[in-house]
């Protein structure tokens, strides 16, 4: 996708992409078809293929590889991505532990493969994952169940990034049932997760018999009623993608509403996101991954708004990405990971201020 950038921003984009190519070429040589998650002291030591094949982030490394193959045509990226995808078949066999994040796992691996190469085996894998996701649908509550906990009425805003798998299955099979499930879920998230000011709940708990909202736990943010920044980012990008596939105006309006809230918050911290926009001012906890994901959503929004609106969203995205580059990126090709200072949640220490694989994907 081409964006109408001024000369300064275009120069920055071009130079940054050259750095990305250099860095990821070296990483691909080192990592190959292992499945990285968090880099420790500049090294992706854990291989999720060996330790947790059903982990929700396992699709991001092959997603990076497919992006690089698509951009450069270098075969090594394709070879490594295919290797990871083969390993992910074990997750289908395990089954227990898979949940709503099958979209994250197979959209960026198998579906990306099929879109780029036409690989029929990858198509089958993507459709298998789509059926698993659709099978989590609660027809009385009109939502897709999140996670595998003892409360089957839980829904998290992250799920918005997984429903594009269902739209892809709709198009691939010509079967509208996948869209019906997706849109019911997106409507439920829109009506119960997004607040009037554009901030979002991370978790909503719904009555499984009728979809009535029961409670809003704090989740990975500071607490109930707070504003977990990556959750806001999932909403921005997720609603924009649902608009892309359905053209339902309410989805674009919702994406814009959350985007305006997000932009107003990161403007207070020079373009980078804290973990939660409604947490105490001290201590300061950052989450770089929220910013880069939100930037993707802002660019997606810019593709669907009138010409006079486009510049606002593009410039906001570029500001976030430039700030991330300046404050949080490591371009040493001998050091695994680019985007530093990612955080999984507000209260956990082991995944606070660390490089997390999805930061580099977005």
Predicted segment positions?
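Glycan-recognition and catalytic cores of secretory/periplasmic carbohydrate-active enzymes
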Residues: 1-362
């Amino acid at each position: 996708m081409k964006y109408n950038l001024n000369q300064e921003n275009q120069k920055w984009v071009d130079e940054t992409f050259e750095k990305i190519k250099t860095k990821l070429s070296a990483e691909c040589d080192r990592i190959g078809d292992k499945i990285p998650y968090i880099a420790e002291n500049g090294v992706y030591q854990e291989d999720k293929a060996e330790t947790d094949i059903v982990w929700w982030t396992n699709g991001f490394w092959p997603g990076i590889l497919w992006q690089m193959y698509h951009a450069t045509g270098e075969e090594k990226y394709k070879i490594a991505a295919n290797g990871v995808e083969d390993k992910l078949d074990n997750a289908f066999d395990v089954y227990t532990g898979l949940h709503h994040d099958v979209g994250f796992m197979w959209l960026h691996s198998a579906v990306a493969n099929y879109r780029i190469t036409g690989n029929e085996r990858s198509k089958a894998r993507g459709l298998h994952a789509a059926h698993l996701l659709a099978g989590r649908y609660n027809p009385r509550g009109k939502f897709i169940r999140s996670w595998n906990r003892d409360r089957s009425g839980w829904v998290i805003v992250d799920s918005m990034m997984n429903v594009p798998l269902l739209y892809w299955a709709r198009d691939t099979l010509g079967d509208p049932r996948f869209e019906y499930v997706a849109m019911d879920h997106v409507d439920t998230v829109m009506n119960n997760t997004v607040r009037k000011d554009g901030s979002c709940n991370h978790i909503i708990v719904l009555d499984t018999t009728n979809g009535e909202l029961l409670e809003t736990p704090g989740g990975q943010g500071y607490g109930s009623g707070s504003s977990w920044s990556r959750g806001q980012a999932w909403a921005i990008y997720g609603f924009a993608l649902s608009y892309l596939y359905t053209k339902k105006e309410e989805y674009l309006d919702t994406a814009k509403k959350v985007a305006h809230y997000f932009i107003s918050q990161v403007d207070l911290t020079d373009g980078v996101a804290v973990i939660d926009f409604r947490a105490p001012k001290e201590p300061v906890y950052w989450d770089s991954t929220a910013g880069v994901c939100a930037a993707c959503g802002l660019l997606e929004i810019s593709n669907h708004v009138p010409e006079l609106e486009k510049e606002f969203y593009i410039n906001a995205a570029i500001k976030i990405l430039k700030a991330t580059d300046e404050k949080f990126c490591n371009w040493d090709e001998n050091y695994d990971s680019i985007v530093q200072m990612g955080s999984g949640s507000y209260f956990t220490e082991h995944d606070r201020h660390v490089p997390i694989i999805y930061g580099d994907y977005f």
